[in-house]
Amino acid sequence: MAKSKAYRAAAEKIDLTKAYTASEAVELARETGSSKFDSTVEVALKLGVDPRKADQMVRGTVILPHGTGKTARVIVFATGPAAEAAIAAGADEVGGDELIEKVAGGYTSFDSAVSTPELMGKVGRLGKVLGPRGLMPNPKTGTVTPDVARAVSDIKGGKIEFRVDKHANVHFVVGKASFSPEQLSENVGAALEEIVRLKPSSSKGRYVQKATVSTTFGPGIPVDVNSI
């Protein structure tokens, strides 16, 4: 597929023979982002793990110090006092059986789902709807919890999830092109620190093998993995 004129113009600013530091890459990403809208800045990593092995599955969450630039839409499966707490924390939609039935019918107009442990027996049956979209609540990411208010606050405050795919790649958002270079660099640093902390003990050799920074529809900017 032919690349757009804007893409080609952005690509010309990038020296593909050079590996940029993370701070240089985010600065360049800001410069090469679309002038028509506030582009999302993303990071992609290739990790030295074998995702087929359970002990090498890298998955986690991190609260970006400057958020993502987008207010996440969060639904919560809860009843009683927990539901009231979720509403007070700013959840966009809260409910028990009725909300479960709504999602079972195909409703997915949200960015994250949280559930109390008590309702997971029912929520777990929504796997066909939530699973493929990465929206199924999970204790490992803090989205199955008695403290649903805290979960909502964290997500609204810039919490992101990351998970290695079957090709050992990890993709995550670190902000908008309108962020300052310092804000983007600090967000990238926070995410990378957590991903490096989660390196499986059974992973041998170089852990972060390749890294790129890009904006929406923009070219990937190679990052020197030694700077990570």
Swiss-Prot record:
Cysteines engaged in disulfide bonds, as pairs: none
Show the CDD domains listed in the entry. Answer: Ribosomal_L1
Listed GO molecular functions?
A: rRNA binding; structural constituent of ribosome; tRNA binding
Gene Ontology biological process: regulation of translation; translation
Superkingdom in the source lineage: Bacteria
Q: What does this protein do?
A: Binds directly to 23S rRNA. The L1 stalk is quite mobile in the ribosome, and is involved in E site tRNA release. Protein L1 is also a translational repressor protein, it controls the translation of the L11 operon by binding to its mRNA.
Q: What protein family is recorded?
A: Belongs to the universal ribosomal protein uL1 family.
Name recorded for this polypeptide: Large ribosomal subunit protein uL1
Task: Cite the source lineage.
Answer: Bacteria, Bacillati, Actinomycetota, Actinomycetes, Micrococcales
